[in-house]
């Protein structure tokens, strides 16, 4: 039986993820269908592994692809810098773990600086949202790099390495690239096609570029934004798509015994998520609500955008308990790293005005409403992971839309990987010149030592000049075949195959890796 050649490390508790779909186009639809079937976790995992194992590598793989994927000859993937994503998402990990690992946007630059200081990490980027925490790195050694990043995540969050390993997913190179492109396009979102994730990917790109942390990862995120835009422009993936905010409103309304017009609504947080909640509440017929925020400016701006007849009352955050006492439904979407509501806060609130349990819908990560609040009979608490029941109704439509987007994702992935592969020839050219120059210099030095004082300065200069000419002439033909001019994939494949041959013949792979590690240690 042929085995899929995807470089994915599965954790024991890993659930399905659409990042697996691209390993073989013919198996993509089967995997999406498996993901949407009602079954327990063990059954689903078994079916997925069966589908993936029955997938054979493409018969028209280039020699370079065969070299990259050969189990016997993996120097290419071991010695070249690898793009790696170490991630945890709502597919693979509980909310309790994700909120401890979450990195606020304001701390992304510091996190990137710390990651790039690790011995085997050249470049890094952070993507932390309510549904995922993903670290993208360019690693000198994929195995050491993964180990260092995982230990960094453990140290930062206080979660044991073993627990992170149990729930993380790892993707390398092309798989990591395609995964990010799918994330940007909304294919990996809880709500397929939602737009907010693309703005979050764009923010991650801006942070990487502002901090100047490397060309590979910044270009990766730049191309991910391009892929996301193409998918939304050229497919129907965003048509009728709900967002996390709209799903939160839908969930609240399904749990609300009375009508939306008679319920007292409290929205805490007027950022992008909070604004979307307000818009969806208005669309559902809510004409009055209280909105709390650190400052009134954002609330005033939202109020101006709303239609006439909608009353939005601003309250400062220090009045949170007084406002909560008057509300039937409370939405929270702030960036606070500590809970706004704990059990001791909620249990002293007067009974809900309509004499039923007060609803808390918390779409923040870390959570704004402590899990202990759910222990109270007077409160019903829902978080981002509870939104799955809202979006479960349109699984078939989501699967169809995902299939529309995959050809674009594959095309963009091939383009980026071609660009990245073309960069690999430059270190080879530099190292080949360095090695031949070292050999030439050693031979000239031996010649001079042998003849001693019998060689005058003029003769020495002539020897230096002629030996350099000889070396340059010898290198002329290899160098021509190591330079990629950007004219097509077939030329690129040929160039990369030549590069691998030169690396192998002249034993440059180990030297390239050692040089990079030495340079990084020198900088530190």
Curated annotation (Swiss-Prot):
Top-level taxonomic group: Eukaryota
Biological process terms in GO annotation: chlorophyll biosynthetic process; protoporphyrinogen IX biosynthetic process
Annotated Pfam families: GlutR_dimer (PF00745), GlutR_N (PF05201), Shikimate_DH (PF01488)
Entries under PROSITE patterns matching the protein: GLUTR
UniProt xrefs under HAMAP family: Glu_tRNA_reductase
Additional notes on this entry: During catalysis, the active site Cys acts as a nucleophile attacking the alpha-carbonyl group of tRNA-bound glutamate with the formation of a thioester intermediate between enzyme and glutamate, and the concomitant release of tRNA(Glu). The thioester intermediate is finally reduced by direct hydride transfer from NADPH, to form the product GSA.
The protein, known as: Probable glutamyl-tRNA reductase 3, chloroplastic
Organism: Arabidopsis thaliana (Mouse-ear cress)
């Amino acid at each position: 039986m042929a085995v899929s050649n995807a470089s994915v490390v599965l954790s024991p508790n890993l659930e399905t993820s659409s990042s697996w779909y691209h390993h073989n186009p013919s198996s993509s639809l089967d995997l999406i269908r498996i993901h949407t079937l009602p079954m327990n976790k063990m059954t689903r995992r078994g079916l997925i592994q069966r589908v993936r194992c029955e997938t054979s590598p493409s018969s028209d793989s280039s020699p370079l692809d065969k070299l990259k994927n050969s189990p016997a000859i993996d120097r290419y993937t071991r010695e070249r810098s690898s793009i790696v994503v170490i991630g945890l998402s709502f597919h693979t990990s509980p909310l309790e773990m994700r909120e401890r690992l979450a990195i606020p946007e304001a701390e992304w630059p510091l996190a990137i600086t710390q990651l790039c200081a690790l011995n085997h990490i050249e470049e890094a980027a952070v993507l932390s949202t309510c549904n995922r925490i993903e670290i993208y790195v360019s690693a000198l050694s994929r195995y050491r790099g993964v180990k260092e990043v995982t230990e960094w995540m453990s140290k930062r969050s206080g979660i044991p390495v073993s627990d992170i390993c149990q729930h993380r997913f790892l993707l390398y190179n092309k798989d990591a690239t395609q995964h990010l492109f799918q994330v940007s396009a909304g294919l990996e979102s809880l709500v397929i096609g939602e737009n907010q994730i693309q703005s979050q990917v764009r923010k991650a790109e801006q942070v990487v570029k502002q901090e100047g942390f490397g060309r590979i990862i910044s270009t990766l995120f730049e191309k991910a934004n391009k892929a996301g835009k193409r998918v939304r422009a050229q497919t129907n993936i965003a048509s009728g798509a709900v967002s996390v905010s709209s799903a939160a409103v839908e969930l609240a309304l399904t749990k609300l015994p009375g009508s939306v017009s008679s319920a007292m609504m409290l929205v805490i947080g007027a950022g992008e998520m909070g604004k979307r909640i307000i818009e969806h509440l208005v669309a559902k017929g809510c004409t009055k609500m209280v909105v709390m925020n650190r400052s009134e400016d954002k609330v005033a701006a939202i109020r101006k955008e709303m239609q006439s007849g909608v009353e939005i009352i601003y309250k400062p955050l220090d009045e949170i308990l007084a406002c909560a006492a008057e509300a039937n439904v409370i939405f929270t979407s702030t960036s606070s790293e500590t809970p706004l509501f704990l059990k001791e806060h909620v249990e002293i609130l007067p009974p809900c005005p309509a004499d039923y349990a007060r609803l808390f819908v918390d779409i923040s990560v870390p959570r704004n409403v402590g899990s202990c609040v759910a222990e109270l009979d007077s409160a019903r608490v829902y978080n981002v992971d509870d939104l799955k029941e809202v979006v479960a109704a349109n699984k078939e439509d989501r699967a169809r839309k995902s299939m529309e987007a995959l050809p674009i994702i594959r095309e963009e992935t091939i383009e980026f990987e071609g660009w990245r592969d073309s960069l690999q020839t430059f270190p080879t050219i530099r190292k080949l010149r360095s090695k031949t120059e070292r050999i030439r210099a050693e031979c000239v030095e031996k010649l001079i030592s042998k003849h001693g004082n019998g060689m005058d300065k003029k003769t020495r200069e002539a020897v230096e000049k002629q030996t350099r000419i000889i070396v340059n002439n010898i290198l002329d033909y290899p160098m021509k075949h190591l330079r990629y001019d950007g004219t097509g994939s077939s030329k690129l494949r040929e160039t990369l195959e030549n590069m691998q041959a030169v690396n192998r013949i002249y034993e440059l792979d180990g030297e390239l890796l050692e040089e990079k590690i030495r340079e990084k240690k020198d900088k530190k």
